[in-house]
Design a protein with these regions (language model features):
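Active-site helix of classical SDR
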Residues: 25, 61
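Active-site loop-to-helix junction immediately N-terminal to the catalytic Tyr of the SDR YXXXK motif
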Residues: 51-59, 71
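Conserved mid-core segment of classical short-chain dehydrogenase/reductases
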Residues: 1-11, 54-57
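Catalytic Tyr-X3-Lys helix of short-chain dehydrogenase/reductase
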Residues: 29, 64, 69-77, 82
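Residue(s) in the substrate-gating loop at a strand-loop-helix junction
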Residues: 45
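SDR active-site lid
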Residues: 74-142
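A short helix-coil junction within the Rossmann-fold of NAD(P)-dependent oxidoreductases
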Residues: 27-36
Length: 173
């Protein structure tokens, strides 16, 4: 998706990646508070921390999902509500499979898979460990933490580097 994507595609990304978490929290948090606490694990993406080449609506909505998770954690921690955000990079699912008849996946999938496609069973083990440790951010690929450090250390350099990668993936550089 890009700037020319229909509004309906942007709305779908927003509804699935942000509003689903809002609706779940509206329903669950009051009940958790009544019980004396609880735990939410929301799924975002490494794109929510780093962004998504070739996927403006996806990357934007995944950033918003992390922002909402942060808000939940900051607002309800004192009431016994824990929050974790799962931020996987490339996991082998139907969503990351190449389109029917295509030799390669999408631009976004190819970029994300550069650090290796993870099997769902590996993801499950990482999630169980992250929840046991009550980590806010649960990363599936350790490289993402280093990418986050690079991004926050020098945003301008990060953006220039990502633009070079984008052009290379498009075959322009």
């Amino acid at each position: 998706m890009d700037l020319q994507s229909p509004n309906a595609e942007w709305q779908l990304s927003w509804d699935v990646n942000v509003m689903a978490h809002v609706f779940a929290a509206r329903h669950l948090v009051p009940r958790m508070i009544e019980r004396g606490g609880g735990y939410l694990m929301n799924t975002s993406s490494a794109a929510g921390l780093l962004n998504q080449l070739g996927g403006a609506a996806y990357g934007t909505s995944k950033h918003a999902a992390i922002g909402f998770g942060e808000w939940l954690a900051m607002t309800y921690k004192h009431q016994g509500i824990g929050v974790s955000m799962l931020c996987p990079q490339a996991v082998r699912t139907a969503m990351t499979a190449p389109p029917p008849g295509a030799d390669e996946g999408s631009l976004a999938t190819n970029a994300a898979a550069g650090d290796g496609m993870m099997e769902p069973e590996e993801l499950a083990e990482i999630v169980v460990e992250g929840l046991a440790e009550e980590r806010f951010i649960i990363l599936t690929h350790p490289e993402v933490l280093e990418y986050m450090r690079r991004k926050t250390n020098d945003y301008d350099r990060w953006i220039a580097g990502m633009n070079r990668l984008y052009r290379r993936l498009l075959g322009e550089a």
